[in-house]
């Protein structure tokens, strides 16, 4: 009888097997609304749990420092080719272990310590790697930050241009972790050209929407594009670097290896290749369109229930609830929805009076539950559940009712029904 990986795990380490099962059950029983999370396909999971994890493969396809890479080369080349096809890029490096690693490789290629970079303020929706003082990007480089308009809570390109003209950064960064609106990459390139800066687009959150043609494409306008491969792209956790400049591509490759990494994780790269193949199918565009439609349905019903949204809505997969009008902090709201098995995250909002550890916002996203098959009607119901819980924070009756409604949704849309690790009874 053929034994599966799960069989070996359960017999070798039942404690870990049981904890994995516990996490599987948690994912099944919760509404996952963290905007940066998603559920990969079973095929991606299989690729990541394969014998590819055994192979060291420093270098690039055809140029390895180790022997025995003939099949590894084919897998990585497939991932590269598919990434280039998805995004229309001339060059792709699929080796970065994460989006942060991808960004750091770009910095190593384009900058010297002490150079000036300019990105969005973290509290307005930016990312740690875009110059936050707690990140290496904020320690090695001079940093100036732009934000959103206090009136519209959206990007003001005239203000960004004025700041860029004053600060003269060597690298201008666009792309965000908590910005619910469309990004105009063409305007950013115009600003970058005017001040003689490189333009980096970090599309970690919107890569799947870009791949589906549902968000403007950064490739024609940006010197470099980085992304994670999970989130809306629905692949394994990892990073990706894209450019249409072949010479710059060579520098970027060297900045990944040997510049910032050693051996690539070829089992993860195989998972990336599988996910990229999935993203090339027509069904993925249908999925991405539903992600946006579901986020808008969630936003609309939250507003109908009296909750305020940053920028008054969303154009993509995420939205930010401004909780000040209901006298809650983001930390409190996060804890309240968690009591009814909804997973979200507290988040700063523009001009937030609270600390980053408390915040005034709650970030919500639609990708994961769209993967489970939920549509507009279900996201409207999710908005009602969230509203009921936040607007009646002290009601045990409401809490129990919300928990039952969450359970009903999870039961209707099962997650990974084929997965289970048999665990022997622990002594």
Curated annotation (Swiss-Prot):
Enzyme Commission number(s) of this protein: 2.1.2.1
Pathway: One-carbon metabolism; tetrahydrofolate interconversion; Amino-acid biosynthesis; glycine biosynthesis; glycine from L-serine: step 1/1
Catalytic activities: (6R)-5,10-methylene-5,6,7,8-tetrahydrofolate + glycine + H2O = (6S)-5,6,7,8-tetrahydrofolate + L-serine
CDD domains per record: SHMT
GO MF: glycine hydroxymethyltransferase activity; pyridoxal phosphate binding
GO biological process entries: glycine biosynthetic process from serine; tetrahydrofolate interconversion
Major enzyme class: transferase
Site (Plays an important role in substrate specificity): 230
Database matches in Pfam families: SHMT
InterPro entries documented for this protein: PyrdxlP-dep_Trfase, PyrdxlP-dep_Trfase_major, PyrdxlP-dep_Trfase_small, Ser_HO-MeTrfase, Ser_HO-MeTrfase-like, Ser_HO-MeTrfase_PLP_BS, SHMT-like_dom
Keyword vocabulary terms for this entry: Amino-acid biosynthesis, Cytoplasm, One-carbon metabolism, Pyridoxal phosphate, Transferase
Binding partners and assembly: Homodimer.
Function recorded in the entry: Catalyzes the reversible interconversion of serine and glycine with tetrahydrofolate (THF) serving as the one-carbon carrier. This reaction serves as the major source of one-carbon groups required for the biosynthesis of purines, thymidylate, methionine, and other important biomolecules. Also exhibits THF-independent aldolase activity toward beta-hydroxyamino acids, producing glycine and aldehydes, via a retro-aldol mechanism.
Protein name in the entry: Serine hydroxymethyltransferase
Gene: glyA
């Amino acid at each position: 009888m053929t034994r599966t990986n799960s069989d070996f795990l359960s017999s070798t380490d039942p404690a870990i097997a049981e904890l994995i099962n516990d996490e599987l059950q948690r994912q099944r029983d919760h509404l996952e609304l963290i905007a940066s999370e998603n559920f990969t396909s079973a095929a991606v999971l299989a690729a990541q749990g394969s014998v590819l994890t055994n192979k060291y493969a420093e270098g690039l396809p055809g140029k390895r420092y180790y022997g025995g890479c003939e099949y590894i080369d084919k897998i990585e080349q497939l991932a590269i080719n598919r990434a280039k096809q998805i995004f229309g890029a001339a060059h792709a490096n699929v080796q970065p272990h994460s989006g942060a690693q991808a960004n750091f490789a770009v910095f190593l290629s384009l900058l010297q310590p002490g150079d000036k970079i300019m990105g969005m303020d973290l509290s307005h929706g930016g990312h740690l790697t875009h110059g936050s003082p707690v990140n290496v990007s904020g320690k090695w480089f001079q940093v100036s930050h732009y934000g959103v308009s206090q009136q519209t809570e959206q990007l003001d390109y005239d203000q960004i241009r004025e700041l860029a003209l004053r600060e003269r950064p060597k690298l201008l960064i666009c792309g965000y972790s908590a910005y619910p609106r469309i990004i105009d990459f063409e305007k950013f390139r115009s600003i970058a050209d005017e001040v003689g800066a490189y333009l980096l687009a970090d599309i970690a959150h919107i890569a799947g929407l870009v791949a589906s043609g549902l968000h403007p494409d950064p490739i024609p306008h940006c010197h470099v594009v980085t992304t994670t491969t999970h989130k809306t792209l629905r692949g394994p956790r990892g990073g990706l670097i894209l450019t249409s400049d072949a010479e710059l591509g060579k520098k970027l490759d060297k900045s990944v290896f040997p510049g910032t990494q050693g051996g690539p994780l070829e089992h993860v790269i195989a998972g990336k290749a599988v996910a990229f193949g999935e993203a090339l199918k027509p069904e993925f565009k249908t999925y991405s369109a539903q992600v946006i439609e579901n986020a808008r349905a969630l936003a609309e019903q939250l507003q109908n229930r009296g909750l305020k949204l940053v920028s008054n809505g969303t154009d993509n997969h995420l939205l930010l609830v401004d909780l000040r009008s209901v006298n809650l902090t983001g930390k409190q709201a996060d804890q309240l929805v968690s009591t009814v098995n909804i997973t979200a995250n507290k988040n700063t909002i523009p001009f937030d009076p609270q600390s980053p550890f408390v915040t005034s916002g709650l970030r919500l996203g639609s990708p994961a539950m769209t993967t489970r098959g939920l549509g507009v009607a279900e996201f409207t119901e999710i908005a009602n559940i969230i509203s009921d819980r936040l607007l009646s924070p002290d009601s045990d009756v409401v809490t129990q009712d919300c928990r039952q409604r969450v359970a009903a949704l999870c039961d209707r849309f099962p997650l990974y029904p084929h997965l289970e690790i048999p665990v022997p009874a622990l002594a």
